Amino acid sequence: MNENEYDNFDDLDDLLDEDPTKLDEAEPDDVQAKGSVYNDSENKEKNAESKDSDGVQVANESEEDPELKEMMVDLQNEFANLMKNNGNENNVKTEDFNKLISALEEAAKVPHQQMEQGCSSLKSNSTDKGTVNGSNPGFKNIVSNTLDRLKENGNKVDTSLAEETKESQRSGQNNNIDDILSQLLDQMVASGGKESAENQFDLKDGEMDDAITKILDQMTSKEVLYEPMKEMRSEFGVWFQENGENEEHKEKIGTYKRQFNIVDEIVNIYELKDYDELKHKDRVTELLDELEQLGDSPIRSANSPLKHGNEEEELMKMLEIDGNDPNLGNLDKELTDGCKQQ
């Protein structure tokens, strides 16, 4: 056995003779080091989770902004009110608008990256301009302005619908003579009238005749007279059943029957399948002239062109003017002077 081999055996012998408890002394330091690394990793994970939790909390706050949500609801309601009168053809537009609302809601949310940057400013009660409760003040202004414009357009639509309703009532079968006269006189003034040197409205004889002809043609049209005449014929029938045999009407019963026959003929003309305004106008005009010459009828229909009673007295009552008023005779002169001053 040489010297090197002997030294090796000595080392082995020393190792075997060493106290076994000393072999574990280094282990706590290693475990402590490993535990420190593990704890550091766990702490980092907890810190990351805490940051994520803070971000989610702020994000949730941003998504639950009551003011912005209220604006969105108002915006949808105003759009629904604006579109409700336009029929089913706007269903596609309504869906598109709902998509737009969803897009606006998404745009209002602050991105997650901005949340992480804004957490420190929120915790420190920063007063800098930026995101507050997850919504941008500039974005709120855009939504608010859009809502105001939508309300303004809704008011314009309501006004337009009201005007269209009035216009449809004028153009329908419920036209009254006052509306027809007003429209025709306006047209006459706009197209046929001229101003004289004294700044007074003047019409030539031919122009006046044409204007009167237009008025008469319109007043004798089916559009104006059919419904009143039809109602008058029906009321005549009821009146004859109730009063035809009364002695008090014996003297005028013949006149009333002739009036009934004229009204019945006019209604029958209007109900012809081949009715033509130009073709039957002359006959209707003749019947109306005869009906007027026969005088008052026993029918008190509000739509009847031959209302019973003194129309002059009714007019004075409406105007609250006493027929015996001495100043009434100067009314024409005052009206003439007023027109000249205008």
Swiss-Prot record:
Basic and acidic residues composition bias: residue spans: 41-54, 331-342
Record propeptide residues: 340-342
Chain segments carrying region Disordered: 1-68, 119-141, 321-342
Origin species: Saccharomyces cerevisiae (strain ATCC 204508 / S288c) (Baker's yeast)
GO MF term set: peroxisome membrane targeting sequence binding
Induction: By oleic acid (at protein level).
Record field: compositional bias (Acidic residues): 1-18
Modified residues (Cysteine methyl ester): C339
Assembly, per entry: Interacts (farnesylated) with PEX3; farnesylation is required for this interaction. Interacts with PEX2, PEX5, PEX10, PEX11, PEX12, PEX13, PEX14, PEX17, PEX22, PEX25, PEX30 and PEX32; the interaction requires well-defined PEX19-binding sites within the peroxisomal membrane protein targeting signal (mPTS) of the PMPs and is independent on the presence of PEX3. Interacts with VPS1.
Additional remarks: Present with 5350 molecules/cell in log phase SD medium.
Topology with respect to the bilayer: Lipid-anchor
GO terms under cellular component: cytosol; endoplasmic reticulum; endoplasmic reticulum membrane; peroxisomal importomer complex; peroxisomal membrane
Family statement: Belongs to the peroxin-19 family.
TM spans (from-to): none
Effect of C339 to S/R: Prevents farnesylation
UniProt record, GO biological process: ER-dependent peroxisome organization; peroxisome inheritance; protein exit from endoplasmic reticulum; protein import into peroxisome membrane; protein stabilization
PANTHER family assigned: PEROXISOMAL BIOGENESIS FACTOR 19
Compartment(s) of residence: Cytoplasm; Peroxisome membrane; Endoplasmic reticulum membrane
Modified residues (Phosphoserine): S62, S304
Keyword set, alphabetical order: Cytoplasm, Endoplasmic reticulum, Lipoprotein, Membrane, Methylation, Peroxisome, Peroxisome biogenesis, Phosphoprotein, Prenylation
Lipidation (S-farnesyl cysteine): C339
Xref: Pfam families: Pex19
Upper lineage: Eukaryota, Fungi, Dikarya, Ascomycota, Saccharomycotina
Protein name as it appears in the record: Peroxisomal membrane protein import receptor PEX19
